[in-house]
């Protein structure tokens, strides 16, 4: 294929699309390659809480990413909506955390990073049924509606002239003088200048195809998460709720997500009745009003997992034009 882009990105989930947007804004030409359709894997499947679960228990590197992204998400959503008329539904509905045995660590983290918090008022627990342990209210924590965010990002990039090469499997690469020159795909060869891999759970698998003997290959594995969607009425639940390792996320239209399972099943993203039953039990016990709301969707996605819980963001130490 001719017309070499300045930047070629493999993977067009949220990270790939957002990376492309930054390069477009800086004046570069960009091509995006995806093995399926843009934004249809883990990014689409996620709940959209704009905070890791219990960030004070996460490595410090995660906090730096969280704080920076929290500063920018509202403006990002507004910019995308103005440009595309597709609303990513950034929604600062707040997050109620029901159990915080490490409350001092939690509030210290919030103080350090200037995240507003309050002791949870009893009104926040209306309709909830759970044992409380130092509950914490984070009123400014927001969410985004992932499918709409992805749709808006893609529309923005298409209008900016970004090339999307979808349903395209990358099979191999040619390397000369410490640089990847060409990607070999099932749709033909694609020459590259700078190459960025944003393939999430599939990154280790792809890296082994491109660089089979690479000692720096990332250690990333898929982690399956299953989710449910309840067709509730608007204002049934007014804020996000985290109870132990599961959560409820109310959308603006009233629908409520319940998630998520954590399963190590390689690249199997099928759903199971067992996980559906567990999530249903969690959701309806925590918030009994959901017993009157039908479950309309049940899905699974594969997010990238690492042993340290820290994402890879770096240039390759030997391949000069490769980043992850």
Where are these regions (language model features)?
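N-terminal Rossmann-like FAD-binding beta1-loop-alpha1 element of flavoenzymes
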Residues: 5-31
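Conserved Rossmann-like nucleotide-cofactor binding loop
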Residues: 15, 38, 202
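Flavin-dependent oxidoreductases
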Residues: 18, 173-176, 185-297, 305
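Glycine-rich FAD pyrophosphate-binding loop
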Residues: 24-45
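Dinucleotide-binding Rossmann-like beta1-alpha1 core, especially the glycine-rich loop
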Residues: 49-126, 132-133, 284
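Helix-loop-beta segment of a Rossmann-like dinucleotide-binding subdomain
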Residues: 85-97, 117-160, 181, 261-266, ...
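Helical element adjacent to the flavin cofactor pocket in flavoenzyme catalytic cores
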Residues: 137-186, 193-194, 198, 204-205
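C-terminal catalytic lobe of FAD-dependent flavoproteins
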Residues: 146, 289-324
